[in-house]
Amino acid sequence: MIEAAVSMSALGLGLGLLLGVAARRFHVESPPILDAIEGILPGTNCGACGYPGCRGLAEAMSEGAAPVTACAPGGRDVALALAAIVETDGGGGAVPGMAEAEPTVAFIFEDHCTGCMRCFKRCPTDAIIGANRQIHTVVTDACIGCNACIEACPTEAIVARVKPKTLKSWYWDKPRTAFEARDTEVAA
């Protein structure tokens, strides 16, 4: 019994040591720009950009094959941060090809839903709830607006709608000083 425990411990220790040496010996250094781009991307690996996950999109952006506006869930803020890293001319806060848009979420018309589970399988954040051959619905707080479910729906029961304003998603405008308010009134 003790021999078995000692042999298993020695085997585990030896293989662990071998894996540690192999990891250091065969380590491949990735370019720093690739790690920086991947750090800015949301990391949901939804595939809405057409690349296999956020790492694939980061590789394409670092090579110049993908635009900074390719990440739909990231939106304008991610595109601006990526434009600064990839050195795209942002034009004073404007990203080429990206319009100012409000965040959207998926909405399922329940009378058209057949319960085929295709949207359920495509959602990267598990925002769609429902069972097989039952009506599905979307949890708006979990939806990132990648629109992967819209493409997967065979009955076109899913549409993108503007994210409803709730206490969690609604923000006040930035307060203005008295001088800024006065300048706005004079200009009008």
From Swiss-Prot:
Concerning InterPro entries, the annotation shows:
4Fe-4S_dom, 4Fe4S_Fe-S-bd, 4Fe4S_Fe_S_CS, 4Fe4S_Ferredoxin_RnfB, Elect_transpt_cplx_RnfB/RsxB, RnfB/RsxB_Proteobac
Q: Say where the protein is mainly found.
A: membrane
Q: Could you tell me the gene encoding this protein?
A: rnfB
Please report the stretch or stretches of sequence annotated as the 4Fe-4S ferredoxin-type domain. Answer: 104-133, 134-163
**What does the note under cofactor report?**
Binds 3 [4Fe-4S] clusters.
HAMAP family of this UniProt entry?
Answer: RsxB_RnfB
Q: What is this protein called?
A: Ion-translocating oxidoreductase complex subunit B
Q: Where is region (Hydrophobic) located?
A: 1-23
Q: Could you tell me what this protein does? A: Part of a membrane-bound complex that couples electron transfer with translocation of ions across the membrane.
Protein residues bound to [4Fe-4S] cluster 2: C113, C116, C119, C153
PANTHER family cross-referenced by the UniProt entry: ION-TRANSLOCATING OXIDOREDUCTASE COMPLEX SUBUNIT B
4Fe-4S domain spans which residues?
29-88
Q: Which domain of life is it from?
A: Bacteria
Q: Which residues bind [4Fe-4S] cluster 1?
A: C46, C49, C54, C71
Q: Which Pfam families match?
A: Fer4_21, FeS
